[in-house]
């Protein structure tokens, strides 16, 4: 797996000294007060999504969940940030619908709600 190391130095991920596990590989872990932590992961695989939008979207979601689990946390919710072209183009609309249906099916399977996006 390739990690975009150049991205991480562009923002301060240690503001407020809450970072327990820094970003870069699995998910980041942040401290939210004395006894609470939050595991966060952003994932994407445009090549997989281009080849098969449904399976590509599921794969991104699944990878993010696996990375969260690797830190000892349980996936409890997700936020999506989907970017597609003009939905009036039938091919783009099809990729959008396939992606949404894949994400929806996998979210129901894992019982992980989409809480924003």
Segment roles from a protein language model:
Residues 1-117:
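Glycine/proline-enriched, intrinsically flexible loops and inter-domain linkers
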């Amino acid at each position: 797996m390739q990690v975009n190391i150049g991205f991480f130095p562009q923002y301060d991920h240690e503001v407020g000294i809450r970072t327990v596990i820094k970003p870069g590989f699995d998910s980041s872990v942040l401290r939210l007060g004395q006894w609470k932590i939050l595991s966060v992961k952003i994932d994407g695989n445009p090549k997989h999504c281009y080849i098969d939008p449904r399976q590509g979207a599921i794969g991104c979601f699944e990878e993010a969940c696996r990375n969260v689990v690797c830190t000892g946390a349980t996936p409890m919710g997700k936020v999506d940030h989907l970017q597609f072209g003009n939905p009036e183009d039938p091919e783009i609309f099809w990729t959008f619908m396939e992606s949404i249906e894949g994400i929806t099916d996998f979210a129901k399977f894992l019982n992980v709600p989409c809480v924003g996006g």
